[in-house]
Structure formats: C-alpha cells, structure tokens
Amino acid sequence: KEARVGIERRQIEEDTSKNIHTDSESLLNFNRASIPLIEIISKPEIKNQEEAYAYLTTLRERLKYTKISDVSMELGSLRCDANVSVRVKGDTELGTRTETKNLNSFKAVVRAIEYETARQIEIIENGGRIVQETRLWDEENGITRPMRSKEESMDYRYFPEPDLPRVHISENRLAAVEKEMPEFSEDKVVRFIAEYKIPEYDAGILSGEIELAAYYEKVTKTSGDAKLSSNWVLTEVLRILKEKNISIEEFSVSPE
C-alpha cells in the first residue's frame, strides 16, 4: 500500500543544544551548538505509526543518498519529533495535537505514536479533553510524560529573517537538479533483480545503504557471479560489520 505525504516547508536553523532526559535530571549537550540544520515540517497526512515509519525511512534514504547528511540519530545529525492527534470518525477537522520529543530511534517513534494515539482515544472516550502540550517519550516504561503545556507557553512569533535575500529557483535549475539525482533504493531493487537475477529480499537489503550497494556491485564485477557475491555480502560481510560495530566503509576487505 502506497501513501503520499506532503512537506509543509523546510527551514534553515542553527542548532543550539541537545536535550538528554533521564528519570532524575535533564542534561544539555552543547557539542553541536551553532551547527546549521534543516527542519522539515511534514503535512498532517500521516495516518498511523506504520506510515510514519515508512515516511521517515524514505526521507532518511533521500537525505543520505543525496549526501545532505549522514542522518545518524546516534550522533545527533538526525532528530525527530512526533505530532499526534485523533478525531472521531466522521469529523473533518483534526483534533488537538500533542508533540512528543526525546525520540532516539525510528522504533521509538513508532512506539510513541502508538502509545499517544491510545492515550488520546481513552481520554476522549471517557469524556475528557486533550491538552495541547509537549510530551517526552519514556523509553524504559514505554509511555509519554508531560513536559510543558503549549497553551501556556510563550508565543515565539516566528518570522522570516529580513537580512537574508529570497532565493528564487528557476524551473531550469529544478530540471537540472532532477537529472543529477542519484539512483534511489527502490530503483536499485528493480535493477538488481533484473540485472543480477537475485531475490527481491536480497536486493532490498543490499540497496538499503548506498555504500553497501556500491560495495556489492564492485564485488559482483570482480567475481563475475552476482548470486555468490550477494550471499557472501549478506552473510559474511554483514556478520562481521555487526560483530565489530563498523560500517561498510570501515570494512578492511577490498571489493576488488
């Protein structure tokens, strides 16, 4: 099943710090202070946690394949907040939303959305009212906790930076950029199946990371046996990468 999710806007910001929350305290990590970042605001068109996961993995792939970012949540180069709202079946307007932070993995995003959806449904079914607020994901207990109420929070009054000129992108420039786009994973899967005659499952794993896909193709070119190369990469190579906790770029065996 395919789903289409629009992007409301992208905005350039400057990183300030990273919040790290524990049961007893909240810490601030300033290691990334002043580093530029891009915030991508998605339209409220994601219907459930499964669609959210699919959207995030696709977005992460696009950002990595185009070398915009290494998109590592562990290193702080990718972060995600989840806005959740529910509505009674038949209603046309979205319900009051909450924003959940402290999500350190895509699996945490899925669990947080699932929990927050169930929490809001229970409140409404019991005659209660959803409060617009920011909540924190408690990974250990699998719940969200209130952080601050947005109904009482300061109005930051966002406005465009007047000292930065507007950038106008022409249709010709857009067309040129589209031609420079790399081959994304879904296209690689189709090509790997057709060209190398490997199963769809194998093609999906091999094309999941651009560096792994490139490594596999070099091994195949060297060995002359696409299936044997696929089996070796998927078993021996990935096993060693997992055991040593390294990336394919750090792997000591040359594909040639």
Question: Which residues are covered by each model-predicted region?
Answer:
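SsDNA-processing nucleotidyl-transfer enzymes
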Residues: K1-A33
